[in-house]
Amino acid sequence: MSLDHRIEVPTNFRRIGLLTRRDGQPVQVPFFARLLESAALAEVQDIHQEALRRVPEPGLVRVDSEAFFAHHFNGEGHTLGVFAGDRLIAYGILGLPAGPDYRYDRFLEDLGLPASEWNRMAQLIGVAVRPEWRGNGLHRRLCEWRLELAHVVHRWQVAAVSAPGNPYSWRNLLAVGLRIKGVKWLSGDQLRYLLHADLRGSSSLDPASVVTIEVSAMAEQRRLLAAGYWGYAAAMEQNVLRLRYARPLPP
């Protein structure tokens, strides 16, 4: 039986907290987070465009269309927003595909999951924070909150992608429990880690199998992933960013 996420996602979802940094300076500004309605489309796009203008190199952040954002207000997903006062300062999109006709990211197929899992699939497919409010942990919180919503509606299979050159993104995804299980190309020329978690639980990792690899060593990472290893943690060694991989233990 498929799930009607439009009914089951709790529209009264709220989170509150305190922002402690603005433009790198200490502040104390309350924030609240809630689900957005389609009237916020222009503000969400504005934050997205601001993020695109500030990426250090092209391709680290995907350029998403107005139709993409609109679909995840009124179609197969929801968008969380974070407000400081009445100003939207961050958003995170939770994609909830209804089935194989979903028009956007098809992570179920990338992961090799069976078609019967479409109605158990949740996708973390867009997040951005206004530059002056970075440093408050909002990116990670938006990951955590979207996982909460996925759990509520029994969307156990959670997936996301992140550019290897965007460690801020993939480190947050690893921190909330996703694991690197593959690599893929977006639009033919944008390399991405493919991350996944099953919220019902997954195998522990074998500590005897741990391998640490430079993030830039993509061929070696591909070899490990093909051999069944999962990327699970970042490590800084000799001022070089690396990833730790390990094999999952048998169930």
Where in this protein do the model-derived segments appear?
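Conserved beta-strand-loop-alpha-helix junction that forms the acyl-donor binding cleft
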Residues: 146, 159-170, 213-215
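Conserved active-site alpha-helix within GNAT-family acetyltransferase domains
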Residues: 152-154, 164-184
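Short hydrophobic/aromatic beta-strand element in the GNAT-like acyltransferase core
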Residues: 77-81, 91-93, 126, 192, ...
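Conserved acetyl-CoA-binding loop-helix of GNAT-fold acetyltransferases
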Residues: 126-129, 135-150, 175
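Conserved acyl-donor/pantetheine-binding loop and adjacent beta-alpha core of acyl/acetyltransferases
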Residues: 89-126
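Short amphipathic alpha-helix that is part of the acyltransferase structural core
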Residues: 12-67, 73-84, 88-89, 206-214
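Conserved GNAT acetyl-CoA-binding A-motif
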Residues: 150-164, 190-191
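Intrinsically disordered, low-complexity, positively biased terminal segments
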Residues: 1-25, 174, 180-251
